[in-house]
Design a protein with these regions (language model features):
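Bacterial N-terminal signal peptides that target proteins for export
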Residues: 1-7
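Hydrophobic helical h-region of N-terminal Sec-dependent signal peptides
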Residues: 8-12
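C-terminal motif of bacterial Sec signal peptides marking the signal peptidase cleavage site
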Residues: 15-18
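Bacterial signal peptide processing site
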Residues: 20-23
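Extracytoplasmic low-complexity, Pro/Thr/Ser/Ala/Gly-rich segments
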Residues: 25-87, 233, 239
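Short, surface-exposed interaction patches in beta-rich subdomains
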Residues: 38-46, 77-79, 88, 94, ...
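Extracytoplasmic
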Residues: 48-50, 59, 69-71, 83, ...
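Extended beta-solenoid/beta-helix repeat architectures
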Residues: 115-119, 125-128, 134-149, 156-162, ...
Length: 239
């Protein structure tokens, strides 16, 4: 069952400091509220084949999805009546995402669309009640969830070489959907109440326990799921 369809309309919050914002200025009416805050920002892809994005501050829910964006590298949007509006800055070779208050009382919902042709290195530092990252139709260099979340779900594409999915902020549930035939090693660094890998369930997992399938060490393309912090339920499954 594909989880991708539940991502549209969910949210994300972001913060960046010390750099000038990168705005989308397609027109004075485009995505703007009565205070002049834009609710859609984007940037041209150019000849980029790889990009890095950091999400710094927290949100209720966070949604990221790989999509065909034409000439755009990314598109980030919030509802017209949202209490937050996105800015994008670039610092040290990474894009950072910032949401500022609009003064409205609408939902703090943010959707991030990433160009599917670009290989993305993503870092989530702000935390969320629910984090959904669907890169099943895209490319990934790495995922790093450094802040806590009640629930994290990610859909992964076929990796290009070794790729690490790191969770260091803690979570009640971590669900990873990996492609068929791709070996996945799991490290429960902070321990776990329950770990299920490809249907095999174990309970009461001590910190530092490693689950590695045969052939993982020698596989050219593979995933390494590193749950540095504790998690209640950790599941590795296939789409």
């Amino acid at each position: 069952m594909r989880a991708r369809t539940v991502l549209a309309g969910l949210t994300l919050t972001l913060l960046a400091t010390g750099c000038a914002p990168w705005h989308d200025d397609d027109g004075p009416e485009h995505g703007r509220d009565g205070l002049g805050q834009t609710h859609l920002v984007s940037a041209a892809r150019g000849d980029r084949d790889a990009a890095s994005l950091t999400v710094v501050s927290g949100a209720t829910t966070l949604a990221v999805r790989a999509a065909d964006l034409g000439d755009d590298l990314y598109r980030i949007s919030t509802p017209d009546n949202s209490g937050i509006a996105p800015d994008v800055v670039e610092s040290g070779g990474r894009f950072q995402l910032h949401l500022r208050s609009t003064g409205d009382n609408g939902p703090a919902a943010v959707e991030i669309l990433l160009d599917r042709r670009v290989r993305w290195d993503l870092r989530f530092s702000g935390g969320a009640n629910e984090t959904l990252v669907d890169l099943g139709g895209g490319r990934v260099a790495g995922l790093d969830f450094t802040a806590g979340s009640s629930r994290i779900e990610t859909i992964l594409p076929k990796p290009e070489g070794p790729v690490t999915v790191r969770m260091a902020g803690g979570a009640s549930e971590l669900l990873v959907r990996a492609p068929e035939g791709i070996p996945v090693r799991v490290t429960a660094g902070g321990g776990a109440a329950n770990v299920t890998v490809d249907g095999n369930r174990r309970s009461g997992i001590a910190g530092g326990t490693v689950f590695a399938p045969p052939g993982w060490d020698s596989a050219a393309d593979r995933y390494d799921v590193d749950a540095v912090a504790g998690v209640s339920t950790l599941t590795i499954t296939r789409p």
